[in-house]
């Protein structure tokens, strides 16, 4: 049947068409069914929605996302026919029943996700199947190969190309913004691509976006990397491993990150960016994505083995995931703290981790036998900050930006300690929730500043954290979460005292 396109003032991040009830019945369609939409020699697969109020017979409604993605306008006349359920759904059902994927099956699933053939519900089933049943290393390797095959790739004709990545989940984990320019200052090429926030209040791309443009194409990434030594860009616009961003979007809704998917996400992006040497950060902690050292070692060994099979040299580092890295959580707050570190105004664990990860790459590539010391020498010479400013300028930012120039939310609230002792535990999930409720990462100036970290002494009335927001109502909501979640556990050296049959806390 032929239909005239009608654009609707809606935006959903999926490919869909809206048909009238009569037209849907004529085609034998129900909500959620698929159709093939053809016009001008092109075609795409879309989900069906049905509306009797907004769409007349003979019209096919599309939201702005579908119109932009598929180059549709109201002048378009399209042909719509039912589209059969893809074979990839059968393969997902097979995994749910406990079977192992074949190479061609995982390739078909990833292809279907990349081309928007699978619905969000079916992608959810894929995620749940791999979370519940798990995946063997060869299945993960096939998934990575399929993700890279259908996407863009950066190809460098010269130089040693390296990269770094964290599996995420840790608030404030912005070591890349310091480590990347340190590595680039040593003469290595580092085309760093990263995701936006998934479970935290800011991803690497969100923080870098405060200072520079992160929406770069593959050609721009190559050009800037060859010009100044590195970039820090958002992965999605590059077209590298396009299935990854689509899987991540659904994982976020499910609040799930299956470990096989973490491995595939990281290594597919690194392969697509042209890297040959990769350093992987694996935060370990009770509320982190990897809960203990034993699980972390297994995760690290699997990543190194899969990397080796993909001709990718991978080194891993198990790092402290029990508390935030640095003290700032949220895009602008983190950007300001990164600049404060590079301007030599503050030190601490953010700097130490940044130099440690950079040092791993220096040792992998033979630049130094003691990578950490080499990284520190570069940092203390001022070359890290100098190179960072070059990267910011190359990505369209202000190369003279200073920490005090970074604007943060003007609505604030400080939570104070009600008792004395020392910080015994910090709930990173609670801090993430407080910062996100305050508006991060969408509101760049929103987030949390942590005044006290583990092991630090606390007196009654001492500030524990300050919430920043751009909107008063979001600040109020974040305060409510902060008062409910109890992100800090404070105790004395004596946790409880027992005397004559009674307990005292």
From Swiss-Prot:
Keyword check for Glycosyltransferase: yes
Chain residues that bind AMP: 169, 195-200, 204, 265, 289
Tagged with keyword ATP-binding: no
Gene Ontology molecular-function annotations: 1,4-alpha-oligoglucan phosphorylase activity; AMP binding; pentosyltransferase activity
EC number(s) per entry: 2.4.2.57
Pfam families named among the record's database cross-references: Glycos_trans_3N, Glycos_transf_3, PYNP_C
Entry function: Catalyzes the conversion of AMP and phosphate to adenine and ribose 1,5-bisphosphate (R15P). Exhibits phosphorylase activity toward CMP and UMP in addition to AMP. Functions in an archaeal AMP degradation pathway, together with R15P isomerase and RubisCO.
Name of the protein in question: AMP phosphorylase 2
